[in-house]
Amino acid sequence: MKAVGAWLLCLLLLGLALQGAASRAHQHSMEIRTPDINPAWYAGRGIRPVGRFGRRRAAPGDGPRPGPRRVPACFRLEGGAEPSRALPGRLTAQLVQE
């Protein structure tokens, strides 16, 4: 019976200690944030503000994606040839006929 009481007392003390530690960490982070910080003050001086305002985090889908790359649909002209200005008109006429 004494062993059960000792276990309950230990669990109670452990729960109180964990609850106290969690509440102290939350209060500490709230003390740092002051509402009188003006982000325009930093931006006007060429300083990039970092923190709760101005920080941009990269989304997982924004980076380069692995896989096949699209190849541009144009080719380099050889021999110093210049592109024809009438070519877009001819292509449009061919598409209309089809």
From Swiss-Prot:
Taxonomic lineage of the native organism: Eukaryota, Metazoa, Chordata, Craniata, Vertebrata
Keywords: Amidation, Cleavage on pair of basic residues, Hormone, Secreted, Signal
One protein family per Pfam: Prolactin_RP
Protein name: Prolactin-releasing peptide
Record flagged with keyword Secreted: yes
Keyword field contains Signal: yes
Region (Disordered): 52-71, 79-98
Role: Stimulates prolactin (PRL) release and regulates the expression of prolactin through its receptor GPR10. May stimulate lactotrophs directly to secrete PRL.
Record's comment on post-translational modification: Amidation of C-terminus is required for receptor interaction.
Main location: secreted
Signal peptide start-end: 1-22
Positions of post-translational Phenylalanine amide modification: 53
Intracellular or extracellular location(s): Secreted
Molecular functions per Gene Ontology: neuropeptide hormone activity; prolactin-releasing peptide receptor binding
Cellular component terms per the entry's GO annotation: extracellular region
Propeptide segment residues: 58-98
Tissue expression as described in the entry: Medulla oblongata and hypothalamus.
Gene Ontology annotations of biological process type: feeding behavior; G protein-coupled receptor signaling pathway; response to peptide hormone
Domain of life of the native organism: Eukaryota
